[in-house]
Each structure stands twice: as C-alpha cells, then as structure tokens.
Design a protein with these regions (language model features):
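Contiguous, well-folded functional domains in the mature portion of proteins
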Residues: 1-141
Length: 141
C-alpha cells in the first residue's frame, strides 16, 4: 500500500470543498486538498517528476508503483503565468517524500483574489483512506 503525505503544512479538507468543479466533482481523480500556511511545497511521495506546467501552477509525480499524483497549486493560478512560483524541481527528477518542489508567494495569489487551496489528486488509482479535515503537517498521511 502506498502512502500519500501532505506536501504542505496547513488545514486538510475534502475535495468537495474546493471551489472548482474539476476537483470538487473529482473529474481528475480522488484525493484531498490543503489550505496552506507556509510557502514551501514538498513532494508527497517518492517518485519521478513527470510534469510541470509551463506556468508552474501544477506538478505531476509518478511513484515507483505507477501511481500518478497531481499537485495543483491554487485555483486559477494558471493566469499568473508562473510569477508566484519558484520551482526547484525539474521534469525527470527523482524525488523523495519531503523534497522541496517549489516555493509559493501565497500573498501575491491572495492579492489577486485567488484561492490558495492545494488539491492533491491521485489520477489513476482508487484512494482508500485519507485525512479530510483538521491540521496537517508536511509528511503526514
């Protein structure tokens, strides 16, 4: 069994609470969302970085067992053209759980009246169990 850990400190919530139907209706897969309270976003799993959007608002990682994870950084942040993100990872990088992926300027995102919530989605497998509310720390399942 693979364990998906939180990529950021904050408050865990159900995907149904995300104000974007792609996530709340689980069109991309199941998972959780975290309302972040720090600017460092870390890998939730060990695996390989498979995708980083040009605008740096989303990162994909595949585990060694083939689980595809999508980390979407904020809602509608694609419109910011990468400005609030200092991405440290590159496509093809091997990452361990807890490795730094990107640093996010949440204040800039909030100042643009955008939601800072971070959906973490398993796109190709069923999710059996997850924390769906309350405080969560980097590395906690």
């Amino acid at each position: 069994m693979e364990v998906l850990c939180s990529p950021v400190n904050g408050k865990a919530t159900m995907l149904e609470n995300v104000h974007d139907e792609m996530f709340s209706e689980k069109m991309l897969g199941d998972g959780i969302a975290v309302i972040p309270d720090e600017n460092e976003l870390r890998s939730p799993v060990e695996g390989t970085v498979t995708m980083i959007y040009e605008t740096q608002h989303a990162i994909g990682i595949q585990t060694d067992l083939g689980t595809d994870i999508l980390i979407h950084i904020g809602i509608d942040t694609v419109q910011l053209h990468g400005v609030p993100f200092q991405t440290k990872a590159k496509v093809g990088d091997r990452v361990k759980q807890g490795d730094l992926l990107t640093i996010v300027d949440w204040d800039m995102i909030r100042n643009k009246n955008m939601d800072v919530i971070v959906p973490i989605i398993v796109t190709n497998k069923r999710v059996d169990q997850m924390k769906t509310n309350g405080d969560i720390r980097v590395g906690e399942p």
